[in-house]
From Swiss-Prot:
It comes from Solanum lycopersicum (Tomato). GO terms for molecular function: calmodulin binding; glutamate decarboxylase activity; pyridoxal phosphate binding. The modification N6-(pyridoxal phosphate)lysine is found at residue 278. It comes from the Eukaryota. One of its GO terms (cellular component) is cytosol. Its cofactor is pyridoxal 5'-phosphate. Transmembrane segments: none annotated. InterPro entries: Glutamate_decarboxylase, PyrdxlP-dep_de-COase, PyrdxlP-dep_Trfase, PyrdxlP-dep_Trfase_major. This is Glutamate decarboxylase. Residues 471-502 are annotated as: Calmodulin-binding. Belongs to the group II decarboxylase family.
Length: 502
């Protein structure tokens, strides 16, 4: 949910209809319900005209969320769009499809589940809810253990990298858990496992590792984290577990790098979340959280309700929600199978390489994303003395592209990058077109007068006394310092986190 911040000015209180004026003569109030009804054609025209100013989802390279599905799946979605998922007694098949999806994902992530056993997991509205549920399970298990030992249980903490998505901050704030972040550094934009284990203490409910950083797409080293944390647990007698936030990478690593150990093959990994609406190839609104075993989900967190017709166990942060996302996920899993997902992910990775090569050939950017990871291309300007990545991002909108520019988290705030997310609907041709458009923009920006002297030193600002004798000290900032100053300004506008959506 985005909180409304629209300011209401007298001149903008009404909508003035264009083509809908055939049906409606009076201006339509913007922020109050109209007193009278209107023809359906007029309502459609008004809403449709408003939406024309939205960006093109296919050219929205900021988002990881799927923007295309096959027509057959669209039909299934429309036929089930009026089904409330929580009505399990009324729609038992939909519930069964969710259970099948949970088991498919549990096996994909190597959960220790036998062929005749049922995996433990639940469908959510996205990875944000999935992370909240996983975090609550860790917190409750930790509290129960501390209570049984007669120890304080009022100061839980969670260890993450500073590159985590904002939903982790929300979990910490909403559920009163201290967030201990491992700072980043230039050239290393993911959590350092050694530093993470170093700040683990007896109050740590879990360490969260990211399989596919939102910033660069890079996979964190979960295997090394497991090894180091196992050693510390043995030394201290603690039982600190690991959660893997595989929102983006959970549908990529199993198909492209099946030998990479990041999942339930590692003993300390107790839960994994993944976004079905990202590389699970489903429209927005579906995520999953899978637990290693029943013991990792405390029974007291599961509610049982019977007022919908039968006993229903439920563990969610919401209640009513659509069924179509679950149905669409099941469609994709059986439609594509392992082979199909592998082909889609290989194609995404191939298109990411095309874009990477094109950007590298320009000689203007440094690529900060990695070859192994989510198919994301993140790149920073080598020289920001004449213009910044924020200006490049803004100019790209003229061509229809939505490419975000943002700064890295602490302690790499002075690095600003552009990021392109390569989804299934981003083709080889689009990659080449984007490269061409970036080249055009750079040529235009090159004609602008320089903002700084060409000679700049990569140190602190140089102090210069004013010749006018006003007693004031004036500072000349070099290229790097000026870039940091610009970035600070953008950070004030954008807020603390610019990591996108789950």
């Amino acid at each position: 949910m985005v909180l409304t911040t629209t300011s209401i000015r007298d001149s903008e209180e009404s909508l003035h209809c264009t083509f809908a004026s055939r049906y409606v003569q009076e201006p339509l109030p913007k922020f109050k319900m109209p007193k009278k009804s209107m023809p359906k054609e007029a309502a459609y025209q008004i809403v449709n005209d408003e939406l024309m100013l939205d960006g093109n989802p296919r050219l929205n390279l900021a988002s990881f969320v799927s923007t295309w599905m096959e027509p057959e799946c669209d039909k299934l979605i429309m036929s089930s769009i009026n089904k409330n998922y929580v009505d399990m007694d009324e729609y038992p098949v939909t519930t069964e499809l969710q259970n099948r999806c949970v088991n498919m994902l549990a096996h994909l992530f190597h959960a220790p589940v036998g062929d005749d056993e049922t995996a433990v997991g639940v469908g959510t509205v996205g990875s944000s809810e999935a992370i909240m549920l996983a975090g609550l399970a860790f917190k409750r298990k930790w509290q129960s253990k501390r209570k049984a030992e007669g120890k304080p249980f009022d100061k839980p903490n969670i260890v993450t990298g500073a590159n985590v998505q904002v939903c982790w901050e929300k979990f910490a704030r909403y559920f009163e858990v201290e967030l201990k972040e491992v700072k980043l550094k230039e050239g290393y934009y993911v959590m350092d496992p050694a530093k993470a284990v170093e700040i683990v203490d007896e109050n740590t409910i879990c360490v969260a590792a990211i399989l596919g950083s939102t910033l660069t797409g890079e996979f964190e080293d979960v295997k090394l984290l497991n090894e180091l944390l196992t050693k510390k647990n043995k030394e201290t007698g603690w039982e600190t577990p690991i959660h893997v936030d595989a929102a983006s990478g959970g549908f990529i690593a199993p198909f492209l790098w099946p030998d990479l150990e990041w999942d339930f093959r590692l003993p300390l990994v107790k839960s994994i979340n993944v976004s079905g609406h990202k590389y699970g190839l489903v429209y927005a609104g579906v995520g999953w959280v899978i637990w290693r075993s029943k013991e990792d989900l405390p029974d007291e967190l599961v509610f049982h309700i019977n007022y919908l017709g039968s006993d229903q166990p439920t563990f969610t942060l919401n209640f009513s929600k659509g069924s179509y996302q679950i149905i669409a996920q099941y469609y994709q899993l059986i439609r594509l199978g392992f082979e199909g997902y592998k082909n889609v992910m290989k194609n995404c990775l191939s298109n990411a390489k095309v874009l990477t090569e094109g950007i590298t050939k320009m000689g203007r950017f440094d690529i900060v994303s990695k070859d192994v990871g989510v198919p994301v291309v993140a790149f920073s300007l080598r020289d920001s003395s004449k213009y910044t990545v924020f200006e490049v991002s803004e100019h790209l909108r003229r061509f229809g592209w939505i490419v975000p520019a943002y700064t890295m988290p602490p302690d790499a705030e002075h690095i600003a990058v552009l990021r392109v997310v390569i989804r299934e609907d981003f083709s080889h041709s689009l990659a080449e077109r984007l490269v061409s458009d970036i080249e055009k923009i750079l040529s235009e920006l090159d004609t602008q007068p320089p903002r700084l002297p060409t000679k700049a030193v990569r140190v602190t600002a140089e102090e210069v006394r004013d010749d006018k004798g006003d007693g004031l000290h004036h500072f000349h900032m070099d290229t790097v310092e000026t870039q940091k100053d610009i970035i600070k300004h953008w950070r004030k506008i954008a807020g603390k986190k610019t990591s996108g959506v789950c």
